[in-house]
Amino acid sequence: MKYKDLRDFIRQLEAKGELVRISQPIDTDLEMTEIADRTLRAGGPALLFENPKNHDMPVLANLFGTPERVAMGMGQESVEALREVGKLLAYLKEPEPPKGLKDLWEKLPVFKQVLNMPAKVLKKAPCQEVVLTGDDVDLSKIPVQRCWPGDAAPLVTWGLSVTKGPHKKRQNLGIYRQQVIGKNKLIMRWLSHRGGALDFREWCQTHPGEPYPVSVALGADPATILGAVTPVPDTLSEYAFAGLLRGDKTEVVKSISNDLQVPASAEIVLEGYIAQDETAPEGPYGDHTGYYNEVDDFPVFTVTHITHRKDPIYHSTYTGRPPDEPAILGVALNEVFVPILQKQFPEIVDFYLPPEGCSYRMAVVTMKKQYPGHAKRVMMGVWSFLRQFMYTKFVIVCDDDVNARDWNDVIWAITTRMDPARDTVMIENTPIDYLDFASPVSGLGSKMGMDATNKMPGETDREWGVPIVMDEGVKKRVDDIWDSLGIM
């Protein structure tokens, strides 16, 4: 199923019983978070708060609160089908020429999909039906949530920030939280390695003192939103990838005040600039770790224009101790990661990011081990191949007889196949999540690899244990008489 815009997605979710409208007045201050959190933890529907207190604009929450809705947003029928998205990305990351006519025929669907990659530029767009400038620019009219009691201020959470480096052909779409600090000002919290921050740094180097243009889209279509959080190759724009997911070109329009292209169907667009010498203390905020993060200075985004559709819908979320919406996104995107990793490391059988590990801080890998030290090669590969795993603190590698998604299996492998001194790899002074207050230095910490595989000659001189397995014939005979035994 494909969706042309957010409203189309809302209609189809509602038809499937995957969205509930809430007409009762609900406060954007804390109440929406509590309702959305309870709903998400119960595996419930997306929520459309039609009457947020003190605002005329409805709020859409918990949109991607189940892996199934993430899959739907990516145009797939099931979570399992997301592996096909991963295979497509793996191919686009390292394309191979067809090996013959048969291979060419098999790749034809991919080539057809590629035709949907270029964005379609419109001259008029729904996102610019209403244009606000000057004193009419007022962020307080948008029902921005304050999510937790200790949060410093309301926080824009689902904004797609559009940036462009001075030497780059394509734009970057990134999702960075933005603290509201005034009628027309937000704090742009982007970490130093993220695309927007890199673009801004290059701009400062080549255009010293000049304001940096930025546009932020709120309420884009699901393919574009999810394209911004998916590990697309550096040579592929998020708009192009969204076109692949949607099966139709992404429609964009030039911002009114700058040359950046924004999703034409977005509900709201904030346009403005970042002054190179203006920063402000951001936070504290409750984050996906389950803790409040420390206060730090980040650039200030000054909004000069707000454009929006008639009767716009504000798309919002919250972050907190897993499960939260980012954790659910992680569960779904996990299926996209697997084929990408397998293309580079065919020995990998499965890859799992436990949601309770804050989506990316721990990874469990199962593999077909072939030689001594093989598990360590896979560890290093996970840390280095995709930048999404730059901040993964713990990598556990097991054999393919272990279910990576079953902690009973994983803990059994760790406690029976590991010697802590021999099978633990420690690496110090590596990039680490800025939000990780457990690291000794902000942004710099250690990583641990755990080799929970069966050991080969060269790794041990001892006789290795053989797993206990019941005789298949006995199991079948007991299966045949089990019901008659009346045990349970």
Curated annotation (Swiss-Prot):
Membrane topology classification: Peripheral membrane protein
Subcellular localization: Cell membrane
GO BP term, example: ubiquinone biosynthetic process
Keyword Metal-binding: yes
InterPro entries: UbiD, UbiD-like_C, UbiD-like_N, UbiD_bacteria, UbiD_Rift_dom
Keywords: Cell membrane, Decarboxylase, Flavoprotein, FMN, Lyase, Manganese, Membrane, Metal-binding, Ubiquinone biosynthesis
Cofactor requirement: prenylated FMN; Mn(2+)
Enzyme's top EC category: lyase
Cofactor binding remark: Binds 1 prenylated FMN per subunit.
Catalytic activity: a 4-hydroxy-3-(all-trans-polyprenyl)benzoate + H(+) = a 2-(all-trans-polyprenyl)phenol + CO2
Primary residence: membrane
Record bears the keyword Hydrolase: no
Alphabetized HAMAP family for the sequence: UbiD
Protein name as it appears in the record: 3-octaprenyl-4-hydroxybenzoate carboxy-lyase
Organism field: Alteromonas mediterranea (strain DSM 17117 / CIP 110805 / LMG 28347 / Deep ecotype)
